[in-house]
A protein has these predicted regions:
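TRNA-recognition modules of translation machinery and tRNA-sensing kinases, especially anticodon-binding
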Residues: 1-420
Length: 420
């Protein structure tokens, strides 16, 4: 038997309705902030991610699904959404649109070769936003407010917004030099990943997950001590907007995020629900990227965005015991007696469905008792029984499956009955 590839999942009907509910809620909420949907290819040129995400990142070095197509071009299944959206912004010359910033959102599968663990898959679904074309602290604050709005709209609590400034390019350069000087004498004691990052991307050492290394990192210089005046002022304005909005936040000077393109504001939304056994899990993250467009041969525009995993959002809802308000039951189940009634039911179903009524019937020639059980299993709100007598008299009994009460109406008036 051929089985599903490791690190992937089948989303069966009982779960897919939860996905659809969440995606619909996200689509609706995001319109309040004037974001428009963009859809980019699932695969892109490998060079897009090598340049846009960063050659030295774990994503590019270890996690991408890369292959040669029949034209001998190097192609990669997208591991994240920002680079592709920025590529599209550049390619379609969106900087010429007077409606700046351009506010875009996306939703779709991403691919990373990661170790399988709870809430993480090698194919995962990511919802993200990008606001490109305005370097303004109020845009950063709006994006952070949107993050909180999304998760709170699903009833989640125990949320912690963690923020930091990684400064502009000049601040980052000075800070990276200080990190190299700090870590170089002891780097041989660190994990192999940290050793390889020392001269390629020293800030990523701060993101190391090895317990022994995390202890040593505590003595490292802090980015906040290397921010120039412009970066400091920008960060203070972002925090002032958050204060005005009444959004609590925690500052973490070691928060750098996993991708190379971040500048100024970086953030993560975390959750410390007691059901996680004291562990803190990251729900989503993002930040500002002021050099990414130029890095991809685009204009000197700036952007900010975030991405969240639908899988991790579902897991968080499950851990907090939150039931989604999903209404997908049938309006009507038609029970039939005899060939003539069964044939009529096919025509009736078509009429009902074209009038916005969710309806179904038996297809296995069950007896009446079996058909009623099927109606119950499907959660039908109402049932009707059609036989030769009902067809002759043009009368049917509409049974409320919740109360057990029935009402006799004309068969021709069934649509009007449900629309009243």
């Amino acid at each position: 038997m051929i089985k599903i590839p490791r690190g992937t999942q089948d989303i069966l009907p009982e779960d897919s309705k939860k996905w659809r509910y969440i995606e619909n809620q996200l689509d609706e909420l995001i319109t309040f902030y004037n974001y428009k949907e963009i859809r980019t290819p699932i695969f892109e040129s490998t060079d897009l991610f090598a340049r846009g995400v960063g050659d030295s990142t774990d994503v590019v070095q270890k996690e991408m699904y890369t292959f040669k197509d029949k034209g001998d071009r190097s192609i990669t299944l997208r591991p994240e959404g920002t680079a592709a959206v920025v590529r599209s912004y550049i390619e379609h010359k969106m900087q010429g649109n007077p409606n700046q910033p351009i506010k875009l959102y996306y939703n779709g599968p991403m691919f990373r070769y990661e170790r399988k663990q709870k809430g993480r898959y090698r194919q995962f679904n990511q919802f993200g936003v990008e606001a490109i074309g305005a370097e303004n602290p109020s845009v950063d604050a709006e994006v952070l407010a949107m993050v909180m709005h999304i998760y709170q709209s699903f009833g989640l609590k125990h949320l912690k917004l963690v923020i930091n400034s990684v400064g502009d390019m000049a601040s980052r350069k000075e800070y990276n030099e200080a990190l190299v000087k700090h870590f170089e004498p002891v780097i041989h004691e660190f994990c192999s990943d940290c050793q390889s990052r020392l001269h390629t991307n020293p800030m990523r050492i701060l993101d190391c997950k090895v317990d022994r290394d995390k202890e040593a990192i505590k003595t490292a210089p802090r980015i906040t001590d290397f921010l120039n005046e412009e970066s400091k002022a920008y960060y203070e304005q972002v925090k002032a907007y958050l204060d005005d909005l009444g959004i609590p936040y925690i500052e973490d000077p070691n928060l750098v995020r996993g991708l190379d393109y971040y500048t100024h504001t970086a953030f993560e939304l975390m959750m410390d629900n007691p059901n996680y056994d004291g562990a803190i899990t990251t729900l989503c993250g993002g930040g500002r990227y002021n050099g990414l467009l130029e890095l991809l041969d685009g204009p000197s525009e700036t952007g900010i965005g975030f991405a969240l995993s639908i899988e991790r959002l579902l897991l968080a809802l499950e851990e907090e015991g939150i039931e989604l308000d999903i209404e997908e039951n049938l309006d009507l189940f038609i029970v039939t007696m005899g060939d003539q009634a069964d044939r009529y039911a096919v025509k009736l179903l078509n009429h009902l469905r074209h009038n916005g009524i969710k309806a179904d019937k038996d297809y296995l020639q069950r007896k009446i008792k079996g058909q009623m059980k099927q109606a119950d299993r499907l959660g039908a709100k109402f049932t009707i029984v059609i036989g030769d007598q009902e067809l002759e008299n043009n009368k049917i009994d509409v049974k409320n499956m919740t109360t057990g009460e029935s009402e006799t109406i004309e068969l021709d008036a069934l649509v009007e009955y449900f629309k009243k």
